[in-house]
From Swiss-Prot:
<dbReference type="InterPro" id="IPR036877">
    <property type="entry name" value="SUI1_dom_sf"/>
</dbReference>
<dbReference type="InterPro" id="IPR050318">
    <property type="entry name" value="DENR/SUI1_TIF"/>
</dbReference>
<dbReference type="Pfam" id="PF01253">
    <property type="entry name" value="SUI1"/>
</dbReference>
<dbReference type="GO" id="GO:0001731">
    <property type="term" value="P:formation of translation preinitiation complex"/>
</dbReference>
<dbReference type="GO" id="GO:0003729">
    <property type="term" value="F:mRNA binding"/>
</dbReference>
<dbReference type="InterPro" id="IPR001950">
    <property type="entry name" value="SUI1"/>
</dbReference>
<feature type="compositionally biased region" description="Polar residues">
    <location>
        <begin position="1"/>
        <end position="15"/>
    </location>
</feature>
<dbReference type="GO" id="GO:0003743">
    <property type="term" value="F:translation initiation factor activity"/>
</dbReference>
<dbReference type="GO" id="GO:0006417">
    <property type="term" value="P:regulation of translation"/>
</dbReference>
<keyword id="KW-0648">Protein biosynthesis</keyword>
<feature type="region of interest" description="Disordered">
    <location>
        <begin position="1"/>
        <end position="29"/>
    </location>
</feature>
<dbReference type="InterPro" id="IPR005872">
    <property type="entry name" value="SUI1_arc_bac"/>
</dbReference>
<protein>
    <recommendedName>
        <fullName>Uncharacterized protein YciH</fullName>
    </recommendedName>
</protein>
<feature type="compositionally biased region" description="Basic and acidic residues">
    <location>
        <begin position="16"/>
        <end position="29"/>
    </location>
</feature>
<dbReference type="GO" id="GO:0002188">
    <property type="term" value="P:translation reinitiation"/>
</dbReference>
<keyword id="KW-0810">Translation regulation</keyword>
<comment type="similarity">
    <text>Belongs to the SUI1 family.</text>
</comment>
């Protein structure tokens, strides 16, 4: 029944039959947290992107809130990547290393 020409002919159920939704799975990293500075598409304003943290969304949001408070700036969590406004790479690196994470500064 996975043929593209097949269709449901008769059903006693009413309404649409919904497909079960699957949660998006992030690819596993190599265990190293990378901090990258990005300005493209942001009108010259720089942000630090923190990738490679293997946590669920609730823990990432909690960690991002803590980093934003310590850095004194704004930020967001988008698709498993933490964005911190401004160039605070050195401060973020020291904070994450204090939590026992392996951190690398990626990019220039």
């Amino acid at each position: 029944m996975s043929d593209s020409n097949s269709r449901l002919v008769y059903s006693t159920q009413t309404g649409r039959i919904e497909e079960p939704k699957t949660a998006p799975v992030r690819p596993k990293g190599d265990g190293i947290v990378r901090i990258q500075r990005q300005t493209s598409g942001r009108k010259g304003k720089g942000v630090c992107l923190i990738t490679g943290i293997e946590m669920n969304d609730a823990e990432l949001t909690k960690l991002a809130a803590e980093l934003k408070k310590k850095c004194g700036c704004g930020g967001a969590v988008k698709e498993g990547i933490i964005e911190i406004q401004g160039d605070k790479r050195d401060l973020i690196k020291s904070l994450l290393e204090a939590k026992g994470m392996k951190v690398k500064l990626a990019g220039g």
